[in-house]
Amino acid sequence: MTMTLSVVAVTHRTAPVTIRERLSLPVEQQCQWLQRWGNQVPEIVLLVTCHRTEVYWLDGEETAHRGVEWLAELGGLTVEELERWVLQRSGAEAVRHAFCVAAGLDSRVVGEPQILGQVRRARDLARAAGTLGPILDRLFSCSLATGRMVRVRAGWSTGKRSLARVAVREAARLCSDLQSARVLVLGAGETGRDVIAALCRCQPAVVWWTNRSPGRLAQIPSEEPVRIVDWSEWPRLVTEADVVFVATNAPEPIVRLEHVTRHARLPRLLVDLAVPRNVDPAISDVPGIRVVTIDDLPADPVPVAAWDGVAVEPYVERAVQRYLRWLEARSIAAEIRAAHETLQSMLERELEKVLRLALRDPARTGEVKRVAAASMARKTLFPLFRALESEPQRVALALRLLAYDR
């Protein structure tokens, strides 16, 4: 049976954060969903980031609707509610999508480095869940290798391209004077650390940094001019800060309406970099406070010239074609194995007939051999003759190959 590779994706290009956050879930739950879906298809991988939730799978037929049903169930939505936000691809287009994602070409900030780690973790999680097979393993491994090479060739490996840098740049634009501002950062994951690094280049008046697990804060280089504070302090500091960046893994808002309405002094700007959102959307209605979500940030403020004139897309396309050729060769190899098994079974049956007849009448052994040989030839060539009218060139090639040893 021919396998079809498919992907369904809800991304920053297709859906707002209000939809994407419904499809965001912690690693433990991702593994559970993989194992649940893995009972239905031979191979499946789930990729979840703040910008996208994507399901890649292998099936015996083109069944993109199955992936939409999976995502709808995951997000507690109906298929009708979700399908307008879903990107669906299969075959070569699904492969091309995977390579573009890993290369950072489909990212909100083109070339951002986080996507490589996220794609790698998705592959490794599927392997741990027992849902990664040879086709998707090769797809993700090749796309990761291509993504790493693209970053080097395009000069993106310097680490200067990230959503955190965009967020700090946008905060500086909205505040007009970030250097005199007091800034609070909640979260010490990859995004939170990137925010701290970007802030240190701007030199605000004060930078407070806190995290629920203090151990992660201890990893910050000592030269960074940041005041590390206890997690219990942030509700007080949120009203003393001019700008607040929130980037935690909390599954629901942690900065709520009561945190900003109890006090006379309010922060001017709240930047929510989390999905699901960590800032209560109701705070947007409080006069004097501006809430910026991940969708409000500029898509990619870095000009195309930052690519240093490197033709990135053709390089990715060549990698896509290499994978597709491997996939085709693997498919043909499977067909050859199936044909071999069929022919072997047929030959064994004919030989059994020959042996039975030869034992009954040894004098007719030669005649029996000729009859059996003719029967085997007819059965071998019959499928080719049947396809002669629709695919004469392929049949001619097959016949030439069968006669190759003459």
From Swiss-Prot:
SUPFAM superfamilies: Glutamyl tRNA-reductase catalytic, N-terminal domain (SSF69742), NAD(P)-binding Rossmann-fold domains (SSF51735). One of its GO terms (molecular function) is NADP binding. NADP(+) binds at G187, A188, G189, E190, T191, G192. Substrate binds at T49, C50, H51, R52, S107, E112, P113, Q114, Q118. GO terms for biological process: protoporphyrinogen IX biosynthetic process from glutamate. It is an enzyme of class 1 (oxidoreductase). PROSITE patterns: GLUTR. Signal peptide: none annotated. The keyword NADP applies. Keywords: NADP, Oxidoreductase, Porphyrin biosynthesis. It catalyses: (S)-4-amino-5-oxopentanoate + tRNA(Glu) + NADP(+) = L-glutamyl-tRNA(Glu) + NADPH + H(+). InterPro entries: 4pyrrol_synth_GluRdtase, 4pyrrol_synth_GluRdtase_dimer, 4pyrrol_synth_GluRdtase_N, GluRdtase_CS, GluRdtase_N_sf, NAD(P)-bd_dom_sf, Shikm_DH/Glu-tRNA_Rdtase. Pfam families: GlutR_dimer (PF00745), GlutR_N (PF05201), Shikimate_DH (PF01488). Its EC number is 1.2.1.70. Belongs to the glutamyl-tRNA reductase family. Homodimer. During catalysis, the active site Cys acts as a nucleophile attacking the alpha-carbonyl group of tRNA-bound glutamate with the formation of a thioester intermediate between enzyme and glutamate, and the concomitant release of tRNA(Glu). The thioester intermediate is finally reduced by direct hydride transfer from NADPH, to form the product GSA. This is Glutamyl-tRNA reductase.
